[in-house]
A protein has these predicted regions:
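Transmembrane alpha-helical segments that form core, pore/gating elements
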Residues: 134-174
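Juxtamembrane transmembrane-helix boundary motif
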Residues: 1-15, 33-41, 60-146, 197-260
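Hydrophobic alpha-helical transmembrane segments of multi-pass integral membrane proteins
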Residues: 114, 178-193, 207
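Generic transmembrane alpha-helix signature in multi-pass membrane proteins
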Residues: 28-29, 58-68, 150-151, 161-166, ...
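Short hydrophobic/aromatic, small-residue-rich stretches within specific transmembrane helices
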Residues: 47-51, 180, 184, 208-209, ...
Length: 260
């Protein structure tokens, strides 16, 4: 029963992830934490595998659809995302030796919930201040920050990615959604490789993993198609509603974890 529930959550999450730039993990992680069936490291791994699979299928869909992508920019920001992904994964592994599963889940929920609230507020401010960073070092540093946050929190980082891309590079939300998925690919790749090298891959049911990956691939393909067809207003509205709801879930997880 829980496998089917995981599949539905992952499909919806990755569909929205590719559609409006949510990434998927930002939905998967708090909802699987809320269900409470698996430990935090297992949830993080399932989320990373699902989001990584989504990013591959979604990016391939955009390439085939001839979506306009600045590959040089994507490569530069992804270099930072890889470095940040390794650092974030290492910090998570270290904190897991200090805090118990419930406490660390609460800390993650508090940080993610706060970042989501900031994202919703900023992206809905009319004529909000934006920058247009062109320097390669600056682009790498932004990517590093995104990779670190995503990897440490066990999410793709979609809403945070979109906010950073809009703020630092003056992108539209529609364009930011495409580049968000690209950076997610590299940050999650570095996280999974780091786990493999360190031998910290948790014991996960093969059935759960297969269901997660298949649902994520399908969600990524359909979400990328919808992104191509939809306008900025639709994407912004869906993004705002979903992220606001996720902030509430994360604060609930934080409250449950920190007072346990």
């Amino acid at each position: 029963m829980y496998v089917a529930l995981y599949g539905v959550i992952i499909f919806v999450a990755t569909f929205l992830g590719a559609f409006v730039g949510l990434g998927g993990g930002v939905i998967i992680k708090p909802l699987l934490d809320l269900i409470g069936y698996d430990t935090i490291n297992v949830v993080n791994f399932i989320s990373a595998c699902a989001v990584f699979s989504m990013s591959i299928s979604s990016t391939i869909k955009h390439i085939r659809a001839k979506t306009k992508i600045d590959y040089k920019f994507l490569l530069i920001i992804s270099i930072g995302a890889v470095i940040g992904g390794v650092a974030g994964s290492s910090l998570f592994d270290y904190l897991l030796t200090i805090f118990d599963n419930t406490m660390l889940k609460g800390i993650q929920g508090l940080i993610l919930g706060t970042l989501l609230v900031i994202s919703v507020i900023y992206l809905n401010i009319k004529n909000a201040k934006k920058f247009n960073v062109k320097n390669n070092v600056g682009i790498v540093l932004v990517g590093l920050s995104l990779g670190f946050i995503a990897s440490f929190l066990g999410v793709g980082g979609g809403p945070i990615n979109v906010t950073f891309l809009v703020f630092f590079f003056s992108m539209t939300m529609k364009d930011a959604a495409v580049y968000s998925v690209g950076t997610i690919f590299f940050s999650q790749l570095s996280k999974l490789v780091t786990m493999g090298i360190k031998g910290t891959v948790p014991d996960v049911s093969a059935v759960v993993l297969i269901v997660a990956i298949v649902c994520a691939i399908i969600g990524g393909l359909l979400g990328a198609r919808m992104n191509k067809r939809s306008d900025e207003k639709v994407i912004k509205t869906i993004f705002t509603i979903v992220v606001a709801a996720l902030a509430v879930v994360n604060y609930y997880n934080a409250f449950s974890g920190l007072i346990a």
